[in-house]
Amino acid sequence: MSAALVRRGLELLAASEAPRAVPGQVQASGTPAKRTRRARAKASQALKLRNSAKGKAPKSALAEYQKRQCRDHLKANLKFMTSMRSTVPESVTQQILQQNQGRKACDRLVAKTKNKKKKKKKAEGTVFTEEDFQKFQREYFGS
């Protein structure tokens, strides 16, 4: 925490622990009490505004800490996902998947590998017979 946040937190604690009027003391009339209350409020306001930007009221250190703390959104997300369960027709899901398979390179590779496998299967069959190989062997190696 920064020093300014610590200072503001201490000021808030000091203001809440300020000495209160003793029950035995009673003011003569209501108007001076209002004036003193207003004067105290203005003084505390000026003290708070002293360490902040002009016209901006300082925020409490606790509120700043809670705002910056990580929040767990798991419960809210699970509630949303379970409440929004809707079945979509198979044709719609297939259409969405097909639209997402556009002209990306990864999609092209899948299409090419399927074609290569088919070509390899065609190439596995041979045109030459065993007699042709033996004839070639005799002619080439001379045995």
Curated annotation (Swiss-Prot):
Residue positions where Phosphoserine is found in the record: 86
Disulfide bonds: none
Post-translational events: Citrullinated by PADI4.
Localization: Nucleus, Nucleolus
GO CC terms: cytosol; nucleolus; nucleoplasm; small-subunit processome
Key words of the record: Citrullination, Nucleus, Phosphoprotein
Superkingdom of source: Eukaryota
Gene Ontology biological process terms from the UniProt entry: ribosomal small subunit biogenesis
Nucleus as UniProt keyword: yes
Family: Belongs to the AROS family.
Subunit (UniProt): Part of the small subunit (SSU) processome, composed of more than 70 proteins and the RNA chaperone small nucleolar RNA (snoRNA) U3. Interacts with RPS19; the interaction is direct and mediates the integration of RPS19 in state post-A1. Interacts with SIRT1.
Name of the molecule in the record: Active regulator of SIRT1
Natural source organism: Mus musculus (Mouse)
Gene that specifies this protein: Rps19bp1
